[in-house]
Amino acid sequence: MMEIKSTQQDGVTVFEVTGEINISTSPELKKLFEKQTSKKVVVDLQKVSYIDSSGLVTLVEMLKKMKAQGGSLGLSGLSDKVRSLFEITKLDKLFVISPNQQEALAKIK
């Protein structure tokens, strides 16, 4: 199960994700992302307990779309478990990753 809270902060769309991002839930995240119109997005993963390969693919697709539109996407609040997955897959080199939402907002402005 996954819940997503979407807010706006100074022209940046913030998605606060809770639960698991997996093959069942990642289409919901992708759909919500495609509806937003901001050039800057932060995905807060602080309350994400699990992410699988389909979740990673969704985040990479979101990043590619933002870059193609001249925008930026940052991630924040990765747990040790989720951060480890990003490091193993080398995705930590692709994304702007911040320890918390405030730092992520500052980095992508």
Predicted regions and their residues:
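Short acidic-hydrophobic, aromatic-tinged amphipathic segments that line or gate anion-handling sites
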Residues: V96-N100
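A generic structural signal for alpha->beta connector loops
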Residues: M1-E3, G11, G70, L94
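Residues at or immediately preceding the N-termini of alpha-helices
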Residues: S26, Q101-Q102
